Amino acid sequence: MDRRNFLRKGTMVAGLGASKALWPPPGSAARSRPDSLSLGAQASSLTASSGTVLLRDDFSKFPAGWLSSPLNQLNGAIQEVHYLSNRGVPLEPWANPFAHLDAWVVSEEDGRPYLEQHLINPKPTLMSPIFLTGDSAWSDYTVEVRVRPLSLADLVGVVFRYHTNRHYYLFALTGGHTARLAVRRPIETTFRVADWRELAANEFAYDTQHYYTLRVENEGPLIRAWVDGKKLLETRDGELTAGKVGVSANIPARFQDFAVTCPVDVKEKIDDRRDRRQSELTRLRSENPQPVVWKKFTTPGFGAGRNVRFGDLDGDGQLEMLICQNIPRVHADDFDQISCLTAVTLDGRILWQSGKPDPRNGLLTNDTPFQIHDIDGDGRSEVVLVRDFKLQILEGASGKLKRWVWMPSAPPDAVRPYELVSGDCIAFFNLSGNPGRRELLLKDRYAHFWIFNNRLEVLWRGQGQTGHFPYPYASEPGGLDKVVMGYSVWDSSGHQLWSQDRALHDHADAVIMGNFSGDPAAAPHVYACGSDEGFIMFDERGEIQKHVRIGHAQNFSVGKYRPELPGLQCMAINFWYNPGIVTLFDADANILAQEEPAHSGSPLLPVNWRGDGQVFALLSGNVREGGMLDGQLRRVVTFPDDGHPDLCCAVADVTGDARDEVILWDQERVWIYTQDRPFRDKRIYAPVRNPLYNESNYRAMLAWPQWQGL
């Protein structure tokens, strides 16, 4: 059976797509307190068979077994910056929003197929596994499903009016004795505790031996909830009035015979909204350059995941690619060590190779300590790396060793499988006042760091909650950098200016400092994606100005995503327990938009694709779930379905016209895309980017406005 027929069997669906509406602003009428009622038995006014079927599924199309591959055997963090196109059984038109959890299996009971959530939720106060379908345009529908709880310890129910995996309505049975209606709010007020607004509840005794038919009817703000034909709850709430649907459970539970229906006139309105949305996307995409292949080559045996560096290794004025393979040691990804380096041109010609390549060593879930940089200022690039407990400098053109020193002794308060530090990442700073950034910072995970000069002599060291990767901010006299790392800032001499380590309870995944307000006289701020702490903004004295708990904030970028607004905007993406949610902030950390365009992580790279001042954000190279987002979080550039790799992505100007190319690769191939049309204006946008010598899977990406005349 071909894949299209396989997906069609047992399922009818109307509409798929990314949601558009943001929750209403504070003070709006839609946010008023609901008029909640707990009701006894009443006859249903609508059956699941009435009206038009939006979707009906008995789950028979799925094969018996796990629906996702056991990603945690690989390490769920692989999806922080890698796109996995094959995550198990094809799910369409369903989706698993928590792509790092292998929560869903299918089998049969008494000859009838069922979908089962089989895990004991590891974070029940923070998230609930969801199996999702439908369209953001769906509204005024009835959703019905048969449910059999296999435990009474926690909730099982129906998700509806779904906007993101942190913003939806839930009708659930819980505790063996209660039926509950609630809305999950997108912003938490307490660390690692989901914010629920209760709408209505009623007593309902249930057990684990029977199936119960749950039904929710939506009509504008009106919500009615039924169990086995008896209406238990009714309320009015307009925070969200449309959205996707699904099932959810914090404990093992089974689901059968899922159906969504609506009146015929509602279906016509849904189709109209979807058609208008698609017409708008078609128009926007036609106005943007289309991606076309510029170059492609293979990496047989020596390819890797997102563990590469770009730089001019041989001095020819062109970028080359340095591909690193690695072998994790001791525990997960905490003590990774480099096994092979391969330098290649963008035509695929190997310049040099150091180590033994092996495709088993290509993927990673961490940073690796190597960079390309002219560390000695002689005009030629070197490769600076940690390997075999040695801090080394190699010739960029040949890979030959120029200089090395032993790594520092591992601090006594650290996890110490080795006497010497194995290294986590390398970043370059100007801490001497000499031309260029010639001092290097080397750190472990996540507590200690050392500053070396370009002769590999230790200048000073520090410790604290270092997070993943530091940021150099040039603000001192003579071009000296401040060291922004974790939730702290140091000056160039090693004095800690401020720290908020004790106030925040999860590490910083990405940090940046700058004045992004659009007012040249304004003071700079520090911004951080603080993992489960969310998105945080500090003033230059270290005081927390905004703390927005949007979930596990993983990566973010800063650029001109909204040309009509002053200053720059910050775009962040979530991962752990809230994956795929993208939030756009202004420079004051106010939320401008929030959507869930994909269900896994992304480096979320800023792309100067048009050259006219509008910056896009790259999700991934995947044909269906990837592409580029604009400042309204619309997918305005997509990639052709031409068989290209989509595991990893990077952005760089490699053709020389100031616009960015998109580099896509996996462990076997590299494809480079450029625009399908030349740039024809008198000046071109050429934003200043993070230097290539400070590359990381955990760096905040900056596209600072700058123009070039033509």
Regions found by a protein language model. Name each.
Residues 119-187:
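Secretory/extracellular carbohydrate-interaction modules
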Residues 136-138, 151, 205-209, 218, ...:
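Surface-exposed coil/turn segments at beta-strand junctions on protein surfaces, enriched
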Residues 189-213:
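Short, aromatic/His-centered strand-loop micro-motif at the edge of beta-sheets
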